[in-house]
């Protein structure tokens, strides 16, 4: 069976427990990386100030075949992630649809995968992520790290599959998951 880790960068939001619980719903390993939050119970503590670099800090500790990512104020839909791996066993990256409270589904159906139409709702082969870590965006923006990784995989001709099922919920409302 294919194994998966979920890396959750956190700054200590109250919603962290909900994110961790959603990850434990399917992951073989869950790593919480606290960024500038020494008071937070976490597997790793860093002070990097950039979500992509915080995610990268977990790389040496991931022992699974695939790695997925979840922000500390979001949740994953467990069955969707596991089913996606079963349906696409040869993929290098699997992008799940993200339910965004303002934008609706992301990636938006019929739109190209470009900046603004890709979120962090993907999983990637761990060895490829280690070889192609997140690159920090322009200073003080922290935008585009997720798309930049997807773009590099597209440029490399990697096998990327798209799931139309919602697998990631951005800032869910109470009772939504």
Task: Please name every model-derived segment.
Residues 97, 160-167:
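Catalytic beta-strand/loop signature of glycosyltransferases that borders the donor
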Residues 94-107:
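Short beta-strand-to-loop element that shapes/binds the nucleotide-sugar donor at the catalytic cleft/hinge
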Residues 74-87:
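Acidic donor-binding/catalytic loop of UDP-sugar-dependent glycosyltransferases
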Residues 12-25:
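Short, well-formed alpha-helical segments that are part of the catalytic scaffolds
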Residues 141-149:
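Acidic donor-binding loop at a coil-to-helix junction in glycosyltransferase catalytic cores
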Residues 46-62:
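Glycine-rich, basic loop-to-helix element that forms the pyrophosphate-binding segment
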Residues 105-124:
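A recurrent flexible, glycine/aromatic-enriched loop bordering the glycosyltransferase active site
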Residues 67:
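Short aromatic/hydrophobic "clamp" motif used to bind/position activated sugar donors
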